[in-house]
A protein has these predicted regions:
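Short Lys/Arg-rich cationic patches that frequently serve as NLS/NoLS or arginine-rich RNA/DNA-binding motifs
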Residues: 1-31
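Generic structural motif
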Residues: 19, 45-47, 164
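Generic detector of low-complexity/intrinsically disordered segments
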Residues: 21, 61, 150-154
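Low-complexity intrinsically disordered segments
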Residues: 84-165
């Protein structure tokens, strides 16, 4: 992960929907440069931290021939690795700034004295970029799957459809 300057606003967390829309995505050869916010938005959590939407798992459910499926699995492995690194950094940030509870959990809430610092550092983390080293996966034109159109939009930097430019 590389450090980039960000425009963190104290007390304001960047929304994941805006990250998907404004994610910086740049393709150079086989490398795709994306923001950490884009990577985290591939698995959307609710306010309790439970994953509600997992676009990576949905990508895995596409009906493709095995010759394409292997490339999708390679892409998924790289995305999950990047996701886990960013999530570990988020957890480390919460653990360093949050309040330890009697049951061993660490909690950080908007009323916490460290909340503004967390938001600023988390926004910086989301604005950092990550290179994903992968070739673009070309799906056959007859690929089917639930939410296919949405997945094509979300994963556009990494996949395309045969015969479509």
């Amino acid at each position: 992960m590389s450090r980039k300057a960000s425009r963190a606003v104290p007390g304001k967390v960047i929304s994941f929907s805006s990250l998907v829309e404004t994610a910086r995505i740049k393709r150079e050869g086989k490398k795709v440069n994306v923001t950490n916010g884009y990577i985290l938005s591939l698995k959307v959590r609710n306010s309790l931290g439970i994953i509600e939407t997992d676009y990576i798992a949905e990508l895995e459910m596409l009906n493709t021939p095995a010759r394409v499926g292997i490339y999708i699995q390679r892409l998924i492995k790289k995305l999950v690795t990047a996701y886990n690194e960013i999530e570990a950094a988020r957890v480390k940030l919460v653990n360093s700034l949050g309040e330890k509870q009697e049951d061993g959990r660490t909690i950080l809430h908007p009323e916490s004295p460290n909340w503004d610092k967390f938001v600023s550092e988390f926004n910086d983390l989301l604005a950092e970029t990550t290179d994903i080293d992968t070739s673009k996966v070309i799906l056959p034109g007859d690929t089917t799957g639930e939410h296919l159109t949405k997945l094509l939009g979300i994963f556009e930097p990494f996949i395309s459809v045969e015969g479509v430019e």
